[in-house]
Amino acid sequence: MFVRLARIPRITRHYRLGLFSTQPKPKPNEYLYYRNKHKSKMEAPIKRSSSAVSLVELEREPFKVTVIGSGNWGTTIAKVVAENTKANPQVFQERVDMWVFDENIDGTMLTEIINTKHQNVKYLPNIDLPENLVANPDLLKSVEGADILVFNIPHQFLPKIVDQLRGHVEPHVRAISCLKGFEVGKKGVQLLSTYITEELGIECGALSGANLAPEVAKEHWSETTVAYHIPKDYQGDGMDVDHKVLKLLFHRPYFHVSVIDDVAGISIAGALKNVVALGCGFVEGLGWGNNAAAAIQRVGLGEIIKFGQMFFPESRVETYYQESAGVADLITTCSGGRNVRVATHMAKTGKSAEDSEKELLNGQSAQGVITCKEVHEWLSTCEMIEEFPLFEAVYKIVYEDVPMHKLPEMIEELDDIVVAGQ
């Protein structure tokens, strides 16, 4: 039985953590969690079309959240998270630490600029950040006491970050990876969320979707997908992180969140779409038009699904079609973003991927450049390169200087050709 709370103009009265209190009337479109008086577990969220109190009753202290990473996507997610921790103090500690790889910007350290001017002038300029978002250049201090870690760094730096964190993160901590890519090593090809789980001994999910950081930062409406497995050591409703808590942490009126449990599916789609986007950038730079870009996306989607089913059979095909992290993210990434920009620049100038990144990305990287190499290494080990002609074609263009105009013949499916009269 749900308990309906009385609505009084300007002041909403409710019980929070067992104490009767009054709070200002909240903004519309927030989520309300009611605890059924006759059940111990927390009920599912009820979306209100009108103003409502966003209430989750915890039987523990509010969760402390730390974001690891401060690039344009890292800062954008930190902005989203800090807005939600401030709006939901009964669930989250208001302060959000954001670990920053500190840099000198015209004589002032980047962390100081973020904490005084509340803008990341290098990676997310002209976007105001919440004052409860605190930049911290010390990785270990930033995660001290954290209950939820949000990883959002270029994935090639993850092993170094994990090495520094090892032994400093408690087993009860939960994590979400916003990284795109794979870890290829002695254990084969691993999801980055799995790598974090195994190396740090904490449960880690993933966030991915059709999310170009500048658009999310400007609060233009978009969707995303969060995937998280409830771990075996789950402490129960009101005591631990679950799908409801994660939705409350990431959902904003301009950033709609779907929470599922297919971590593998959204991670694979999020990593491999960057490789496909390089292919789209090549044909754009060559001036081949929309038909060619559509062909690249068609082949790319097929190879993404095949890769998932072949190497991560726990992933679900419907995730690629139904979730923002699937085909929607593929379309968005192939329409713009770093990978397309870098590949287009390569096609127009003849410059390498490395030089193009340096010229265009202000110290950041196009993740597809690294991912296509990781995928090539794994497929070579498995002797399955021929099963993924687009992924291999992108690798050869980037790393072996194969001419881009050969792209169609490299991905052509010869077995499907029917020659008249034969």
UniProtKB/Swiss-Prot annotation:
Cross-referenced InterPro entries: 6-PGluconate_DH-like_C_sf, 6PGD_dom2, G3P_DH_NAD-dep, G3P_DH_NAD-dep_C, G3P_DH_NAD-dep_euk, G3P_DH_NAD-dep_N, NAD(P)-bd_dom_sf
Active site per UniProt: 273
Keyword Oxidoreductase applies: yes
MF-aspect GO terms: glycerol-3-phosphate dehydrogenase (NAD+) activity; NAD binding; protein homodimerization activity
Reactions the enzyme catalyzes: sn-glycerol 3-phosphate + NAD(+) = dihydroxyacetone phosphate + NADH + H(+)
Sequence positions that bind substrate: 180, 338-339
Cellular component per GO, a single term: cytosol
Ligand binding (NAD(+)): 69-74, 157, 180, 213, 338, 367
GO biological process: carbohydrate metabolic process; glycerol-3-phosphate catabolic process
Family as reported in the entry's similarity comment: Belongs to the NAD-dependent glycerol-3-phosphate dehydrogenase family.
Protein name: Glycerol-3-phosphate dehydrogenase [NAD(+)] 2
